[in-house]
From Swiss-Prot:
This is UPF0761 membrane protein VP0125. The keyword Transmembrane helix applies. It is found in: Cell inner membrane. One of its GO terms (cellular component) is plasma membrane. It comes from the Bacteria. Keywords: Cell inner membrane, Cell membrane, Membrane, Transmembrane, Transmembrane helix. Signal peptide: none annotated. Belongs to the UPF0761 family. Residues 295-314 are annotated as: Disordered. It holds the Pfam family Virul_fac_BrkB. It is a multi-pass membrane protein. The chain crosses the membrane at residues 41-61, 104-124, 139-159, 185-205, 217-237, 249-269.
């Protein structure tokens, strides 16, 4: 019993210094990677690509009769659960933009598809930089992955919404106990969706192996921050509506930009947490060492990939 208590004390005594070292390293890593600058860049690209993405998504869903009206439900669900306050104004503006794209030619539609691919490509590049990945995926593989996201993604989302609507319509949910449990599940559904979306992003996008536990921690941090930021941002907009006095009818535009920027800050922060957990050997390094180790790691991975390519050609 005494040995067990001593082992727990030893673990606790080592836990505090490890946590301090981790948070110091994380802060230095955030500074080195200029997360705030990259979040602004991704927010700008997102605003340029959000209409093309919605257009591609809705056009794919419209090809399947079983997903009729799913596009409207999907837009409403996203606005209600993932865009805090002024969601109706943003929803109306996006609907007008998407409706106008229906007048475009096939060439214009092709450019919309390219713009949607650009957004996914930039997300891929930024996350791989956080993980110090130098060995890029082959162009064919990258294009196949982006194509799969743009085609299978809407189908899976539409299928999940259709399944949820079917379950909701079942008479079995008239039971008070089951109905209460289902309502509780729906209340936690946005957080669960955020968690699994972040987890998939941190596990699948980097072109290197990421431990599931590290990805789960980063995804949990990002999902919790995302839910808290929704409530905080909505509170700020409703309690301090000075932006409406300045921008008037155009107030939805800066609101959307600030919200998208905040979302990318959270996404990149969760990615930094995930990547830092896998670099425990560097937790004691200073900022200069972080910079040099990052550059050397990228150089080593690049030389290893070139060596493997040479050996394959031989």
């Amino acid at each position: 019993m005494n040995q067990l208590s001593e082992s727990y004390k030893a673990r606790l005594s080592n836990l505090l210094p490890s946590c301090v070292a981790f948070f110091k390293y994380l802060l230095k890593r955030l500074t080195h990677d200029r997360v705030n600058v990259n979040a602004g860049y991704l927010a700008y690209i997102t605003l340029l690509s959000i209409v093309p993405m919605l257009t591609v998504l809705l056009s794919i869903l419209s090809k399947f009769p079983v997903f009729a009206n799913v596009g409207e439900v999907l837009q409403g669900y996203i606005i209600e659960n993932f865009v805090p306050a002024s969601g109706e104004a943003v929803h109306t503006a996006l609907q007008e933009f998407v409706a106008n794209t229906g007048k475009m030619s096939a060439v214009g539609g092709g450019f919309l598809f390219i713009a949607a691919l650009m957004l996914i490509s930039n997300i891929d590049k930024n996350l791989n930089y956080i993980w110090r990945v130098k060995d890029k995926r082959r162009l064919v593989f990258s294009f196949s992955m982006y194509w799969m996201v743009l085609t299978l993604g809407p189908i899976l989302v539409g299928a999940s919404i259709a399944a949820t609507s079917y379950v909701t319509s079942l008479q079995i949910l008239e039971n008070e106990t089951l109905s209460g449990a289902f309502n509780l599940f729906l209340r936690w559904l946005p957080l669960l969706l955020s968690f699994f979306a972040f987890l998939g992003l941190y596990i699948l996008v980097p072109n290197k192996k990421v431990h599931l536990a590290h990805g789960a921690v980063g995804a949990a941090v990002a999902a919790i921050l995302f839910e808290l930021s929704k409530k905080g941002f909505a509170l700020y907009i409703t309690q301090f509506p000075s932006y409406q006095l300045i921008y008037g009818a155009l107030a939805a535009i800066p609101i959307l930009f600030v919200w998208v920027y905040l979302c990318w800050m959270i996404v990149l922060l969760g990615a930094e947490v995930t990547a830092a957990l896998g670099e425990q050997e560097h937790w004691s390094e200073d900022l200069d060492m972080i910079h040099s180790s990052a550059e050397s790691q990228l150089a080593n991975e690049g030389s290893e990939s070139s060596d493997s390519a040479n050996s394959t050609s031989q």
